[in-house]
Design a protein with these regions (language model features):
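Single conserved hydrophobic/aromatic residue that forms the stacking wall/gate
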Residues: 1-5, 9, 274
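Glycine-rich, proline-tolerant flexible connector loops at the mouths of alpha/beta enzymes
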Residues: 29-53, 152-155
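Catalytic alpha/beta core domains of metabolic enzymes, predominantly
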Residues: 152-259
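Conserved anion-binding
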Residues: 112-133, 142, 148-150
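Hydrophobic faces of well-ordered beta-strands that scaffold small-molecule active sites
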Residues: 30-32, 65-70, 89-93, 117-121, ...
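Acidic (Asp/Glu)-rich catalytic clusters
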Residues: 55-62, 79-86, 107-112, 137-142
Length: 274
């Protein structure tokens, strides 16, 4: 096997293995990658159509929702086929501040093809109270699976997050899940995620918290799956299989750590102010 072919085979095994471990760990929503306009390359988690994921999903678990992300203006959804249930269950649409209307339009076309839809309101910290109420009103009309607060620049402190969460919770219909997607520019990703969960602990609002193994993500990275699930097990009576999560880290994450760098650093800690 050539070195290039061997590397592709390795990357395919990593993607497949991580998805398999996460579903065995009882993770409810597994984001498998992105949908992009370009054709899928073997061993990449940038897909063109949902069938590209069939290589990586080793027997769907009915308790899991398998998701891919799209940027509101970087994917031609006309190529998206009707949902046949074999790979993706849902698509997360991320849109920037002041582009909610456009994001919901593409979301509507995706929903019409039989996919569940989640929305990510990037840079939610930029929204005023009236902006948040208007966003909630639009989301209520659409009726997606959920809407996530996104701390795009890792600039939020707990009071910022809870202020936004309170407004959205007060105005979102109760059958719509509210989520939080953190970035770790100030090393606040885990702390804010815990605060978000604790705030809703006595609520009947269903919530979501985004995380990744070892906090892997662009730049400063995200909240870590291993810490979030441990916290939820110990403090909120959840039943995530930490052995599967830690085994995924031992088996697969070394490969990423050798090739890529992410996580807190001083430049990222000051970048959110500029």
């Amino acid at each position: 096997i050539s070195s290039a072919a061997s590397d592709v085979y390795k990357r395919q095994g990593v993607i497949r293995g991580i998805i398999h471990k996460l579903q065995n760990a009882n993770i409810e929503v597994i984001e498998c990658g992105w949908l992009k306009d370009s054709e899928n390359k073997e061993g990449s988690s940038f897909y063109h159509v949902p069938s590209d994921l069939l290589t990586y999903i080793d027997g769907k678990k009915k308790e899991c929702t398998y998701v891919a992300m799209i940027d509101w203006n970087r994917y031609d959804d006309s190529v998206l086929p009707e949902n046949d249930g074999t790979s993706l269950d849902a698509i997360r649409v991320v849109f920037p501040y002041q582009k909610a209307k456009e994001g919901l339009k593409i979301g509507a076309r995706i929903k019409a093809k039989g996919y569940k839809v989640f929305f990510q309101a990037a840079n939610t910290l930029a929204y005023s109270e009236s902006d948040l109420i208007e966003l909630a009103d639009r989301i209520n009309v659409f009726k997606p699976e959920g809407l996530s607060i996104v701390d795009t620049f890792g600039a939020m402190y707990e009071d910022d997050l809870i202020r936004i969460a309170k407004i959205l919770d007060a105005h979102l219909d109760n059958d719509i899940r509210l989520g939080f997607h953190s970035h770790n520019n100030q090393q606040m990703a885990f702390a804010n995620s815990m605060a978000f969960v604790n705030y809703f602990a006595e609520s009947n609002r269903n919530i979501m918290v985004d995380s990744s193994l070892c906090g892997m993500g662009r730049g400063a990275g995200n909240a870590t799956t291993e810490l979030i699930t441990s916290f939820l097990n110990r403090k909120h009576h959840k039943n995530y299989n930490l052995d599967e999560i830690l085994d995924a880290i031992d088996t697969y994450m070394v490969w990423f750590e050798e090739k890529f760098k992410w996580g807190y650093s001083t430049p990222y800690s000051v970048s959110y102010t500029h």
